[in-house]
Regions:
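Conserved beta-strand/loop scaffold segments within soluble protein domains that form the structured core
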Residues: 104, 113-398, 412-448, 452-454, ...
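N-terminal amphipathic, basic helical "cap/leader" segment at the start of enzyme domains
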Residues: 1-148, 318, 323-324
Length: 463
């Protein structure tokens, strides 16, 4: 661990070296943006629990770790290493290793005419005008130190452009792989997704880690939804237990848009998932759906900020948490209804299961309403597995592990049922299946003779 002063000096040295060689260092506007962002980070520093948006989460484990940029580390993966992360039915998968595009393992299947799926560094070099039109336009680096840090160290990530009136039927999968090193390492992937009016598409961000070691992935995604677009965004976090992950999704919605955000948090030591849609055009709809499952000493923080900035918009937030061991979860959901956003219809719900006496959840649904003709509700619940339900299943001849799995899956399926993209849902269900099996199998009430090996069967087969 190092002091705050030592950490700042380390970042100053890293930034000085980085900006000399970074992609786009010869573009005055980008150089100025990076410098302004780094100055802002130096000014505000890492957040503390005195900051209202971070009151439940202590990030000192990140702030006091001497991370070095992963840009000088490993950037290649063998096909064998990547095989566990291939997804059936997905023909377009960009692979990023330690924040940089790995071209060889990436897949670019046939896409509709005009659709562009590439990396940010390439776009900065070959088409800076299109990149400048949206990059950093919607993110508020004044409020968020991690977003400022990401902007300062922006170099690579995904760039996706969907032309007007285009339907992309297959999901566009973005796989981010962090690899361990002798020293703690950090990467700052930056993604820019622009969907023009009347287009439809699905995007997946998938975070994994290899090799062990302390890694930190600090990601920002800007998603621009043009008028009348229908978009789905999935974020899957399944890194190892020495990994830190801060992920920020900033969504800018135009008129009559329908945008869905799904988040599934399964791994990591400390994870912060920020989702911030702004309904900037009349008649927009937004659904934020999430599931977080923690065990051991995991810390999983979900911060949702939905801004209703125009009339006749609706939003829904549904988040479920399952926590065991000493895991700690956070749900902080804010809905802000601006003065002119009349006829707003907004709802947020957070439901949680605590499976041990040491598991914790902090939940704070929050409404800020500055208009007078609105319909807004919010609520949160915290509970445990019902003994009567478990007894009923056991009395029907279902073994204890399977009975617990069925009850946990029924709770998790509330979120799964909102995932409509076939290959993505099937993949996520498999991940949750394995995660909940381990959780049910290791429950304190399960006798040794009843503990079982994972059969790999689906939930329908178990039931």
């Amino acid at each position: 661990m190092i002091t705050a002063t030592q950490q700042l000096e380390s970042y100053l040295e890293s930034f000085s070296e980085f900006e000399k060689l970074a992609t786009g260092h010869d573009l005055p506007w980008l150089r100025r943006l990076r410098q302004d962002a780094f100055a802002r980070f130096c000014e505000v520093g890492f957040p503390t629990t005195h900051d209202e948006d971070w009151r439940f989460t202590n990030v000192s484990a990140i702030a006091q770790t001497p991370f070095r940029l992963a840009r000088n580390g490993r950037f290649r993966l063998s096909q064998k290493e990547l095989e566990p992360y291939r997804v059936a039915g997905v023909a377009c998968q960009l692979v990023f290793v330690n924040g940089r595009l790995a071209r060889e393992p990436s897949l670019l299947g046939k896409l509709p005419d005009g659709v562009k799926v590439s990396n940010l560094a390439g776009e900065i070099s070959s088409n800076p005008g299109a990149f400048e039109a949206h990059f950093g336009r919607y993110l508020d680096i004044r409020r968020d130190a991690f977003s400022a840090l990401n902007t300062a160290f922006t170099e690579d990530g995904a760039f996706v452009h969907i032309p007007r009136g285009t339907l992309v039927g297959e999901p566009i999968w973005l796989l981010f792989v962090s690899t361990g090193d002798d020293a703690p390492s950090v990467s700052h992937p930056r993604n820019l997704i622009v969907a023009e009016e009347d287009s439809q598409a699905t995007f997946v961000e998938d975070y994994v880690s290899l090799d062990g070691g302390t890694v930190f992935c600090n990601t920002v995604t800007e998603l621009v939804a043009g008028d009348h677009t229908v978009l789905s965004h999935y974020m899957i976090e399944r890194e190892h237990t020495e990994a830190f992950n801060i992920s920020t999704l900033r969504i800018q919605q135009g008129r009559s848009t329908n945008v869905v955000s799904h988040s599934v948090l399964l791994g990591g030591a400390l994870v912060r998932n920020n989702v911030h849609p702004v309904l900037a055009g009349d008649g927009g709809e937004c659904l934020i759906n999430g599931l977080f499952i923690g065990n051991g000493h995991q810390y999983l923080d979900n911060y949702m900020l939905v801004e209703h900035a125009s009339p006749h918009c609706s939003s829904r937030q549904f988040y479920n948490g399952i926590l065991d061991g000493h895991a700690h979860g956070v749900f902080h959901g804010r809905i802000i209804v601006h003065k002119d956003a009349q006829k707003t219809d907004a709802k947020q719900t957070n439901r949680n299961l605590l499976l041990s006496d040491d598991a914790q959840i902090d939940t704070k649904p929050q409404l800020e309403i500055y208009a007078d003709d609105v319909k807004c509700t919010h609520g949160a619940t915290i509970g445990q597995i019902e003994g009567d339900a478990l007894f009923y299943l056991r009395s029907r001849g279902i073994d204890e592990v399977s009975a617990r799995k069925l009850l946990l899956f029924a709770f998790a399926s509330e979120c799964l049922d909102r995932m409509k993209q076939g290959p993505v849902r099937k993949h996520v269900e498999g991940l949750i299946n394995r995660c909940l099996f381990r959780m049910a199998n290791s429950a304190p009430g399960v006798s040794t003779e009843n503990r079982r090996e994972d059969s790999g069967r689906s939930w329908e087969e178990i039931g």
